[in-house]
Amino acid sequence: MKHITPTQFYIHPVHVDLIGCGGTGSLVLSGLVRLHLAMKSLGHPYGLEVTAWDPDRVSQSNIGRQLYVESEVGLFKTDCLINRYNMHFGLAWKAEARKFYTKAYYPAHSIIISCVDSRTSRAEINSYLPESGPYVIDAGNDDSVAQCLIGNGSEQLPYPYQVLPELIDTAVKEKNRPSCSLAESLGHQGLFMNQWTATAV
């Protein structure tokens, strides 16, 4: 299928809402920094403008699998990551330490990246989407499988949740694992599963 990127992506800042800053989201954010720098070096006038959304705080169990360090335990994930990259690369990206909520209007040069880990969260995101509009990338993984889908609600490129409605089926029972050590978590998911998913984004 041939797809043409809208002109607005080339002449305006590309607005990115990254929802979820856990195992996959924290790695996606580091990739967005590199993408921003690459776009600027290739002549894009603005690069990316990113807002990261996540109400969670860093816990001890996050260290190792996610991009956090011991001194950040107890702090909001979004604040840790956004402050780090803003300071290191002179960016002005935004941290929202809360659940994602809808905007009244999405410019044509908008991208939503969902890196959440539950059907309930995906269903909430889906409820905010207009009939067609922003590009939506859904990246998720289980113990041994992952998915990465993109869509904008058009007939040619439907939203991820139109392609795989089971992703937002809240009637399906979720796997609810308690927080555990890095060693214990490796018993049910490989160390680089999140990295693979983030790279696909």
Language model regions located:
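N-terminal Rossmann-like NAD(P) cofactor-binding subdomain of oxidoreductases
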Residues: 44-45, 53, 116, 140
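Conserved beta-strand segments of alpha/beta enzyme cores
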Residues: 49, 92-94, 135
